[in-house]
């Protein structure tokens, strides 16, 4: 049968995100959330949720002009953030020590880190004018690219440690260009080369890295921007992009795909029968080879985890049946 996996955050208060470097209570709550979640639903694939350490705190408060971007430095492996991230990952990895499930570490693209670090920055998708970076795009895109390269160096160093020292099986790299925030030429020239570099570097240590093309809160991406990324599997917002799993398989050269459920749709509020029916629809449309069933993004933190088991049981029953006649097309899932 296909593997089934869903991920959700463990900190209910968004203001606690990123406080784990200094706040032990928030840090411990983040770790303990994995233990509690596993008792409720033991996934076929696990991911370390680093809520308390989102996002990498690159120092960029001094940036006032595009030229200042060239002064940004990569985060040191001896930083408090790096040390806490390694501790969190090792301890969460221990929670899954007796599991056969591969365990992934969450990683974010250089631009996501940079946009969050700038004086007017916001976590993309959470609002904020971001007028500073928009001005930099126009004034000196090369400086923006140089900053992305610098930030990527710290990300790559952390990812190497996560794989080699913490024992994670791969990196789950989150990227996006939601709503065309960066013009296509800018993205392809100054942004994506360093996202690819992060992924390619991780590929030297693991052959199961996943690319998550984040469509958070319904803001879409042009998936064609990501066809040149060399991931083992791809996850995107099927419902926002209007690109089904089978269509994604073709778009990404036959690579494995992950997802299918809208996180706040039938999975969150449907009956068991509706959830099971939708699981069958996903598998009828995408097939079982090269497919992992999950969601477009993280599911709501308050979801009833028994619903996730409904999906797995449906996948088990689906696999046990004789070859099914395809009843659904991709449009029925949108």
List the model feature ranges, each with a label.
Residues 9-11, 51-71:
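A short glycine/small-residue-enriched secondary-structure motif
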């Amino acid at each position: 049968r296909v593997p089934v996996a869903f991920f959700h955050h463990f900190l209910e208060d968004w203001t606690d995100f990123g406080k784990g470097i200094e706040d032990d209570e928030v840090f411990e709550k983040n770790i303990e959330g994995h233990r509690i979640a596993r008792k409720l639903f033991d996934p076929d694939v696990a991911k370390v949720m680093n809520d308390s350490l989102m996002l990498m705190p690159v120092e960029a408060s001094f940036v006032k002009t595009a030229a200042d971007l060239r002064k940004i430095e990569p985060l040191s492996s001896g930083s408090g953030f790096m040390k806490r991230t390694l501790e969190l990952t090792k301890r969460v990895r221990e929670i899954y020590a007796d599991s056969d499930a591969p365990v992934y570490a969450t990683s974010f693209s250089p631009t996501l880190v940079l946009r969050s670090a700038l004086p007017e920055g916001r976590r993309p998708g959470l609002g904020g004018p971001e007028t500073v970076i928009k001005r930099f795009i126009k004034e000196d895109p090369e400086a923006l690219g140089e900053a992305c390269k610098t930030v990527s160096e710290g990300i790559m160093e952390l990812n190497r440690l996560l794989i080699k020292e913490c024992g994670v099986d791969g990196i789950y790299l989150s990227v996006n260009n939601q709503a065309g925030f960066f013009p296509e030429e800018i993205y392809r020239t100054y942004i994506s080369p360093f996202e690819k570099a992060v992924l390619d570097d991780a590929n030297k240590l693991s052959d199961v890295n996943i690319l998550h093309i984040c469509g958070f809160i319904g803001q879409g991406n042009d998936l064609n921007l990501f066809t040149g990324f060399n991931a083992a599997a791809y996850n995107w917002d099927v419902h926002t992009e209007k690109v089904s799993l089978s269509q994604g398989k073709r778009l990404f050269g036959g690579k494995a795909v992950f997802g299918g459920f809208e996180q706040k749709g039938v999975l969150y509020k449907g009956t068991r029968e509706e959830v099971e029916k939708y699981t069958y629809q996903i598998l009828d449309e995408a097939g079982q080879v090269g497919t992992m069933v999950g969601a477009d993004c993280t599911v709501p933190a308050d979801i009833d985890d028994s619903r996730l088991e409904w999906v797995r049981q449906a996948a088990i029953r689906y696999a046990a049946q004789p070859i099914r006649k395809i009843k659904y097309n991709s449009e029925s899932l949108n």
